[in-house]
Amino acid sequence: MDDDASMSIRWGGFFESPARNLGLQLMSSVPAERDTKQLLSGSPFLHHQHQQHVPHHHHQPHHPRDCGANGNANGGAMPPPPATEAPPSMPMNFARSDMWMHPQQQQQHHHPREHKALHNLTVGHGSSHIAHHDPVGYGMIPGTHTLQMMQQQTEPQLQPPPPPQQPKEECISSPLIEENVPVIDEPPPPKKRQQGRQPKVPRAKKPKKSAAPREDGAPPNAPAPRRRGPRKNIGMVINGIDLDLSRIPTPICSCTGAPQQCYRWGAGGWQSACCTTTISTYPLPMSTKRRGARIAGRKMSHGAFKKVLEKLAGEGYNLNNPIDLKTFWAKHGTNKFVTIR
């Protein structure tokens, strides 16, 4: 059983060497050290075919690692391979490096999607191709990994393009602000329209004139009392005689047997305080429709009262005496809801 647990079984196919100088020959002269292992050197077929053509044999040093790799199942050490074996004359120009690796080594050193690489190594003046042995796999130089070789070949192709240059405005770095320096908030610049105009100067307010003192002694700032207009002179001409109704005494009503003064109603009209069209009593009862008010008595308008005066003046009645309106109330009824207290 070999170092890579391959059971000395070779499954790879070997073909003739392609054209030389493929750019894969990394080292021109490498001495055959103790780590060098000949590919397919133990094959009985090749040993039988080319044993007679080998003039002399090369001595291969024994190493304890080779004994451990060729040990039997019981743990016993197998003897080293005979020194009489010679490298085959059949050229082996290239070997598969990762094909002979153990699955655990492949997981440690390679990604499962990486492709297999073929390496061609030329050693010596006779251009004989020898596959060097390394714990990584056959056909590789000790200490060299397949991925490193591939990176050396693809370095000029895998260089990333230079990043695009940013515009000058973005490259300008913001000014550094110290921690202890207080930040002063500057007001925003005025608008374009305001830049062309001159700032307005506030006008000076005119001083107020002091109010002159009043004649009645009231303070000057006190509101003036509202004056009432001249009182209208309610007068009428009856039979060529001017009468002032303001000087005529208040009419009365004697429907209850006792004279009761009437109430003013409207502009120059009168209202009874003791009788309605159905009731004649003093005082009138309280209204059931309006709280706090009494039933309104019979009414007489200003025009109707004027006609009464004209009639009495024609008969020679003295208007300086109170007029009894008991017989002059309207018989059809003109009562309205008027508050009488």
Curated annotation (Swiss-Prot):
Report biased composition (Pro residues) as residue ranges. 78-90
Transcription regulation found in the keyword field:
yes
**Composition-biased stretches (Low complexity):** 68-77
Q: Where is the composition biased (Basic residues)?
A: 48-62, 190-211
Location relative to the cell: Nucleus
Q: Which residues form the signal peptide?
A: none
GO biological process: any one? Answer: response to ethylene
Transmembrane residue ranges: none
Keywords recorded for this protein, A-Z: DNA-binding, Nucleus, Transcription, Transcription regulation
UniProt cross-references to Pfam families, sorted A to Z: GAGA_bind
UniProt similarity note: Belongs to the BBR/BPC family.
Q: What does this protein do?
A: Transcriptional regulator that specifically binds to GA-rich elements (GAGA-repeats) present in regulatory sequences of genes involved in developmental processes.
Extract the PANTHER family matched here: PROTEIN BASIC PENTACYSTEINE3
Question: Could you identify this protein by its name?
Answer: Barley B recombinant-like protein A
